[in-house]
Amino acid sequence: MIVGLIGVVEKISALEAHIEVQGVVYGVQVSMRTAALLQTGQKARLKILQVIKEDAHLLYGFLEESEKILFERLLKINGVGGRIALAILSSFSPNEFENIIATKEVKRLQQVPGIGKKLADKIMVDLIGFFIQDENRPARNEVFLALESLGFKSAEINPVLKTLKPHLSIEAAIKEALQQLRS
């Protein structure tokens, strides 16, 4: 599995960058925001999400871990694929997107190409509670994703996350949350 690339940017287009790593050129799907920060001929370090489908092997690249986490979460929403997730990241920074979800600005979300009212509403419902407002947000988001990958729904996870002690390690928080969810 490819989780990162460090190499020289050979070519940049709106949603793709070609990165040369020791003689091999990788085509990496990127948001327009990421593409704007890359420079041809310069060294780049991208966090990679590798998606293997029946008909394609895709690499998605991110400069920031927060973008990658948001992208992975968006892909879990039924009706959101890589193209729409990249369109969201092209339109909003993770912080801007978090504010849109927190303030329930469905109309702003509908401005993203490929997102209509129905999908915007679905994204809002699925992501309410994903962004937790406290100093432990990155750890809480990881706990949320871990519990979700185990099959729990956000409606079950969110109340449990609020009861967790604030300074638990990610592993301890997952264990405690699982105990609460299974009781």
From Swiss-Prot:
Region listing for Flexible linker, in residue ranges: 139
Localization (cell): Cytoplasm
GO MF annotation list: ATP binding; four-way junction DNA binding; four-way junction helicase activity
One GO CC term, this protein: cytoplasm
Gene3D superfamilies given in the database record: 5' to 3' exonuclease, C-terminal subdomain, DNA helicase RuvA subunit, C-terminal domain, Nucleic acid-binding proteins
Keywords: Cytoplasm, DNA damage, DNA recombination, DNA repair, DNA-binding
Region feature (Domain I): 1-63
Region described as Domain III: spans on this chain: 139-183
Keyword DNA damage: yes
GO biological process, one term: DNA repair
Region (Domain II) location: 64-139
Homology family: Belongs to the RuvA family.
Subunit composition and interactions: Homotetramer. Forms an RuvA(8)-RuvB(12)-Holliday junction (HJ) complex. HJ DNA is sandwiched between 2 RuvA tetramers; dsDNA enters through RuvA and exits via RuvB. An RuvB hexamer assembles on each DNA strand where it exits the tetramer. Each RuvB hexamer is contacted by two RuvA subunits (via domain III) on 2 adjacent RuvB subunits; this complex drives branch migration. In the full resolvosome a probable DNA-RuvA(4)-RuvB(12)-RuvC(2) complex forms which resolves the HJ.
Known role: The RuvA-RuvB-RuvC complex processes Holliday junction (HJ) DNA during genetic recombination and DNA repair, while the RuvA-RuvB complex plays an important role in the rescue of blocked DNA replication forks via replication fork reversal (RFR). RuvA specifically binds to HJ cruciform DNA, conferring on it an open structure. The RuvB hexamer acts as an ATP-dependent pump, pulling dsDNA into and through the RuvAB complex. HJ branch migration allows RuvC to scan DNA until it finds its consensus sequence, where it cleaves and resolves the cruciform DNA.
This protein's name: Holliday junction branch migration complex subunit RuvA
Source organism: Helicobacter pylori (strain J99 / ATCC 700824)
